[in-house]
């Protein structure tokens, strides 16, 4: 059993922290909105703290899962941040999808304090978090990875070390770049099927048995065909992730024309008041263009 803190109880962090309790770990949570932490304690047990610093005190491992770079800096380095509560020898594991730069920044800040850092963004969405089946992409030191991997197994089906600090975030960027292209292709395929008078559900059932198969196809085609877009990762968050990837691409010289185009398409869906629709709502944009 490990003594851990979990900072950030959003749609991902809430069930992830719950899985840690279910696996027998001693868990203390903190959330910016205190009512959410109270709800979590009522549902899972464990303890809650009033500040990130308080949550981190005495813990072997501290997990964070917050919104963006600035949120991460605040909960780690702020006046009441985690860094002021962690002890030497502890490990900070960040599940936020953030920039590789902020991962390196935090690692460099806490290294002189003998606190280890692993960037560890996840993939699998809310369903993956609830079912304990996330994929975790990690950057950092092998020994620290080996220490935290058994704990992370509470909510993951795959956790791999990809390289030094920052490698986890860079891998998550690859993940989001790939998803953008796949979802746009699926949206175009369904749009074409509808325009051609085909039964889209039957079409997907057939082609998903062949080379076109993908996770997005298997999990999103029915809701897309029905025009329902509240079953997955919100566009606002996807645009944040693509923005991070496109910024990194400008620095490393990568050319991402499809990702940049899909990001623009998502901005058009936002203009349709679809900010909280999931990423499969690219089909809604195509349907609107036909009407």
Curated annotation (Swiss-Prot):
Instruction: Name the positions where NAD(+) binds.
Output: 5-19, 97, 240
The Enzyme Commission number assigned here is 1.1.-.-
Disulfide bonding pattern of the chain: none
Q: Name one GO biological process term.
A: organic acid catabolic process
Q: Where is the active site?
A: 172
Q: Name one GO molecular function term.
A: NADP binding
InterPro entries documented for this protein: 3-OH-isobutyrate_DH-rel_CS, 6-PGluconate_DH-like_C_sf, 6PGD_dom2, 6PGDH_NADP-bd, HIBADH-like_NADP-bd, HIBADH-related, NAD(P)-bd_dom_sf
Kindly give the Pfam families that the UniProt entry links to this protein. Answer: NAD_binding_11 (PF14833), NAD_binding_2 (PF03446)
- List UniProt keywords, sorted A-Z: NAD, Oxidoreductase
Q: Which family does it belong to?
A: Belongs to the HIBADH-related family.
Designated name of the protein? Uncharacterized oxidoreductase Sfri_1503
């Amino acid at each position: 059993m490990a003594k851990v803190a979990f900072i950030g109880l959003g749609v991902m962090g809430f069930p992830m922290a719950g899985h840690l309790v279910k696996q027998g770990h001693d868990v203390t949570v903190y959330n910016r909105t205190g009512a959410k932490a109270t709800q979590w304690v009522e549902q899972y047990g464990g303890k809650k703290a009033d500040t990130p610093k308080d949550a981190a005190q005495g813990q072997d491992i501290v997990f964070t899962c917050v919104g963006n770079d600035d949120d991460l800096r605040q909960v780690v380095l702020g006046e009441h941040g985690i860094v002021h509560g962690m002890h030497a020898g502890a490990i900070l594991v960040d599940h936020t999808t953030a920039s590789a730069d902020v991962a390196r920044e935090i690692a460099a800040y806490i290294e002189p304090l003998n606190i280890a850092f692993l960037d560890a963004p996840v993939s699998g969405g809310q369903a993956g978090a609830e079912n304990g089946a996330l994929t975790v992409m990690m950057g950092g030191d092998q020994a620290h990875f080996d220490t935290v991997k058994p704990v992370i197994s509470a909510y993951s089906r795959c956790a791999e070390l990809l390289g030094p600090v920052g490698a986890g975030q860079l891998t998550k960027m690859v993940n989001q770049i790939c998803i953008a292209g796949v979802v746009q292709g699926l949206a175009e395929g369904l749009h074409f099927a509808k325009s051609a008078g085909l039964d889209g559900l039957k079409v997907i059932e057939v082609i998903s048995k062949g080379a076109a198969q993908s996770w997005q196809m298997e999990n999103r085609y029915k809701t897309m065909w029905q025009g329902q877009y509240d079953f997955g990762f919100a566009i606002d968050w996807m645009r944040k992730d693509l923005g991070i990837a496109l910024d990194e691409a400008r620095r490393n010289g990568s050319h991402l024309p499809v990702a940049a185009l899909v990001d623009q398409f998502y901005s058009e869906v936002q203009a349709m008041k679809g900010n909280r629709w999931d990423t499969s709502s690219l089909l809604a944009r195509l349907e609107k263009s036909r009407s």
